From Swiss-Prot:
GO terms for molecular function: ATP binding; metal ion binding; NAD binding; NAD+ kinase activity. It comes from Sodalis glossinidius (strain morsitans). This is NAD kinase. The gene is nadK. Pfam families: NAD_kinase (PF01513), NAD_kinase_C (PF20143). GO terms for biological process: NAD metabolic process; NADP biosynthetic process. NAD(+) binds at D73, G74, N147, E148, H158, R175, D177, T188, A189, Y190, S191, L192, S193, Q247.
Length: 292
């Protein structure tokens, strides 16, 4: 066996039989080709693969050269926040809805993976955001996101008053239902639904997108990817939260501030050589086809 990769992890949280079938097919296919395969514990239990070598996401990150995530973008986001801490490449097979991040078609995935495993792929380093809750000089609760960090009410939608500082310089104050702070990866997710700009994946920038601002002059703002964003609350509205990729929530207490910056970690996302980001946008967003 001649391959760029030797140890491969299979990742996902299957929700329907087709996804489970893809996990099982991939497991046997990789084994037949002589790869050392590590499967997430939960998947092996679902499939009753008692002979499989299993591990956690951290185990896969430490031991594997490549992680194959099967599922939708939500599965990829959950796995990527952990796998980004390790020296591992990640690719996705789409068994969800949109599939911006899990872009391999399950019907042709094995053929595409054959090329990828032979070293024919392109790599994209996608940066993460890091959000931390601080009180004065004491910082505590911390999380990361691939797509976005969102300031929002915890229970009932209502107006929030806050100030935004960029690199310790006051930028603007706002009355709105919240604020979306998105990476280029996340610019085609929640941020796009709120009217934010599309940023191509390797742009070194962060988008700040207001949610239902109480002024007609409030518009999305794109800033340098190396900037630090501070959210300050003059009078805290009860039940505020920061959510990361809509999967992890950090509650905000009175007197606390939020700091959001680019993480030190990057997701090493790979695609087949024929991957075209703009074709993906066109097919996922229903853009018009070429005229000539």
């Amino acid at each position: 066996m001649t391959s760029t990769f030797q140890t491969i992890g299979i990742v996902g949280h299957p929700r329907h039989p087709n996804a489970l079938a893809t996990h099982e097919t991939l497991y046997h296919w990789l084994n037949e080709k002589g790869y050392h395969v590590i499967m997430e514990h939960q998947i092996a239990r679902y499939l009753a693969l008692h002979e499989a070598i299993t591990g956690s996401l951290a185990d896969i990150g430490q031991q594997a050269d490549l992680a194959i995530v099967i599922g939708g973008d939500g599965n990829m986001l959950g796995a990527a926040r952990i796998l980004a801490r390790y020296d591992i490449k990640v690719i996705g097979i789409n068994r969800g809805n949109l599939g911006f991040l899990t872009d391999l078609d399950p019907d042709s995935a094995l053929a595409q993976l054959s090329d990828v495993l032979a070293g024919h792929f392109r790599s994209e380093k996608r940066f993460l955001l890091e959000a931390q809750v601080c009180r004065g000089d004491v910082c505590g609760r911390l999380s990361s996101s691939i797509n976005e960090v969102v300031l929002h009410p915890g229970k009932v939608a209502h107006m929030i008053e806050f100030e935004v500082y960029i690199d310790d310089t006051f930028a603007f104050s706002q009355r709105s239902d919240g604020l979306i702070i998105a990476t280029p990866t996340g610019s085609t997710a929640y941020s796009l639904s709120a009217g934010g700009p599309i940023l191509t994946p390797l742009v070194d920038a962060i988008a700040l997108v207001p949610m239902f601002p109480h002024t007609l002059s409030s518009r999305p703002l794109v800033i340098n990817g190396g900037s630090t964003i501070r959210l300050k609350f003059s009078q805290l509205t009860p039940d505020l939260e920061i959510s990361c990729d809509s999967q992890i929530a950090l509650p905000i207490q009175d007197g606390e501030e939020i700091f959001i910056r680019r993480s030190d970690y990057y997701l090493d996302l790979i695609h087949p050589n024929d991957y075209n980001y703009f074709n993906t946008l066109s097919s996922k967003l229903g853009w018009s086809k070429k005229l000539f």
